[in-house]
Amino acid sequence: MISVIIPVYNQADKIGRCLDSLLAQTYRDFEIIIVDDGSTDHLDEVLLDYELKLQKAKIPYKIIVQENRGANAARNRGWNESQGDFLLFSDADIFWRADALEKLVNSLMRNPQASYCYSSFRLGRKKFHLWPFDPERLRREPYIHTSALIRRQDFPGFDNAIKRFQDWDLWLTMLEQGKGGLFYDDFLFTVAGGGRISKWLPSFAYKLLPFLPQVKKYQEAATVIKVKHRLPYDPK
């Protein structure tokens, strides 16, 4: 079974499309764990409507409400409450292609040496084609997103102290533990446009757009990751 874990903070206007895309999946052996990380919008009303849809579709689910503790803490809470052999962390502003879960789980089943499987994605109408798994590239830049399918037995948990580049930190930690990934060469999900663009900004943009305030913050955060994992960095 796959546990789809969705941390949510004030995204009542986005999560419906995410849940609709999960309801439409061709692969049906999954549960949904929603972690409301202290939202102050009308998320509870939206989720009440979707509880009926999930029950009708016979999809197991949990809705967890906690005080705002940040994305990593919400993801870890969902992980601790989940039951699946595979984990998929989906942000609320993502909607999935109908065969996404099927493609990801089949890829991992055919490749037992891989601990996780990731794909390319779209940000609004723009395509972001990622690269095959490469440990050296991964040490240089954060090119693998959080929304990969992960074997539960290989997942070490997120570091709650890390506020940015949580995905890079996770994959580097797993790499240090001898665990690698697998690239599925297709676009399996779309990130809704109009949100916090820096959250999904590709790593190369940090070098091209250094004047943007959010990019500067992410450059500083990248240094934190490099220091933690003993990677080369520019101390300037």
Across the structure, where does each feature detected by a protein language model lie?
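Glycine-rich, basic loop-to-helix element that forms the pyrophosphate-binding segment
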Residues: 66-82
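Short aromatic/hydrophobic "clamp" motif used to bind/position activated sugar donors
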Residues: 87
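Conserved donor NDP-sugar-binding/catalytic core segment of glycosyltransferases
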Residues: 99-131
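Catalytic beta-strand/loop signature of glycosyltransferases that borders the donor
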Residues: 120, 182-188
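Acidic donor-binding loop at a coil-to-helix junction in glycosyltransferase catalytic cores
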Residues: 164-172
